[in-house]
């Protein structure tokens, strides 16, 4: 009976050793994700501190070597403490620039606005246009629109009218003035009633007509 127990103990001692050496694998007991990532990083990205510099694509540069870290970066020099990059004073971008590229150390304007925008419409440089009958405008090289409003002369009548597509009022019936509530033409004497003859002041249409009484020609009553 004692012999059987001893043999059993020997089997128990041997079996764990066999399992450890033959059956255990990394697939059965995977390592922690953090340990795997750290291990992979060490394999892919070597530590070049104090030895060189690495750009965005993983290319290694020696100490003292000049390189561009990325397609839109300023040039750098690989130093002991890491890249030392230029910081130039870039030219200002034109305020009318419509397309800016960042493919170098400084941004570059590739397309400048070459038109003017006015009330939702675009006009070429130096193009003249009339947004209304009374306005004359031009697209300046500065991409700004300058407009001038028509300076209309004072009409020589008391009843001017506005024609379509014309800015300034016109006197369809020529110069005139008021004689009381009656409009009379300028340049002649006009009998406005049985007793009064009136005429407009020369050039002063806004003044009331000058009138004089004559012998009344109305019917006399007894």
Swiss-Prot record:
Any one biological process term the GO annotation gives: positive regulation of neuron differentiation
The keyword Nucleotidyltransferase is annotated on this UniProt entry? no
Q: In which tissues is it expressed?
A: Predominantly expressed in the brain (at protein level). Also detected in bones, including femur and calvaria, heart, lung and kidney. Isoform 5 is predominant in lung and heart, compared to isoforms 1 and 3. Isoform 4 is expressed in femur and calvaria at higher levels than isoforms 1 and 5. Isoforms 1 and 4 are expressed at higher levels than isoform 5 in kidney and brain.
Q: What Gene3D superfamilies does the database record attribute to this sequence?
A: 6.20.200.20
**The organism's place on the tree of life at top rank:** Eukaryota
Question: Pfam families attached here?
Answer: VWC2L_1st, VWC2L_2nd, VWC2L_C
Location comes to: Secreted; Synapse
Known InterPro entries for this protein? Answer: VWC2/VWC2L (IPR042979), VWF_dom (IPR001007)
GO cellular component terms, A-Z: AMPA glutamate receptor complex; extracellular space; synapse
Q: Where do the VWFC domain residues begin and end?
A: 51-110, 114-172
SUPFAM superfamilies linked to this entry: FnI-like domain
Q: Quaternary structure?
A: Peripherally associated with AMPAR complex. AMPAR complex consists of an inner core made of 4 pore-forming GluA/GRIA proteins (GRIA1, GRIA2, GRIA3 and GRIA4) and 4 major auxiliary subunits arranged in a twofold symmetry. One of the two pairs of distinct binding sites is occupied either by CNIH2, CNIH3 or CACNG2, CACNG3. The other harbors CACNG2, CACNG3, CACNG4, CACNG8 or GSG1L. This inner core of AMPAR complex is complemented by outer core constituents binding directly to the GluA/GRIA proteins at sites distinct from the interaction sites of the inner core constituents.
This chain belongs to which protein, by name?
von Willebrand factor C domain-containing protein 2-like
Q: Which gene encodes it?
A: Vwc2l
């Amino acid at each position: 009976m004692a012999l059987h127990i001893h043999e059993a103990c020997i089997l128990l001692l041997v079996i764990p050793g066999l399992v450890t050496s033959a059956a255990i694998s990394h697939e059965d007991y995977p390592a922690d994700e953090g340990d795997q990532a750290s291990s992979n990083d060490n394999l892919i990205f070597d530590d070049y501190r104090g030895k060189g510099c690495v750009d965005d694509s993983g290319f290694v540069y020696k100490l003292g070597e000049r390189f561009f870290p990325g397609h839109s970066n300023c040039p750098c020099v690989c130093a002991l403490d890491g890249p030392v990059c230029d910081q130039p004073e870039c030219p200002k971008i034109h305020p009318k620039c419509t397309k800016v590229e960042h493919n170098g150390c400084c941004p570059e304007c590739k397309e400048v606005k070459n038109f003017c925008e006015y009330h939702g419409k675009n006009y070429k440089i130096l193009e003249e246009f009339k947004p209304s009958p009374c306005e004359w405008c031009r697209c300046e090289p500065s991409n700004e629109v300058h407009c001038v409003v028509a300076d209309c002369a004072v009409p020589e009548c008391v009843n001017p009218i506005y024609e379509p597509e014309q800015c300034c009022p016109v006197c369809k019936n020529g110069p005139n003035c008021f004689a009381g509530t009656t409009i009379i033409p300028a340049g002649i004497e006009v009998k406005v009633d049985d007793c009064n003859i009136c005429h407009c002041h020369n050039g002063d249409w806004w003044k009331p007509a000058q009138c004089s009484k004559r012998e009344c020609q109305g019917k006399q009553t007894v």
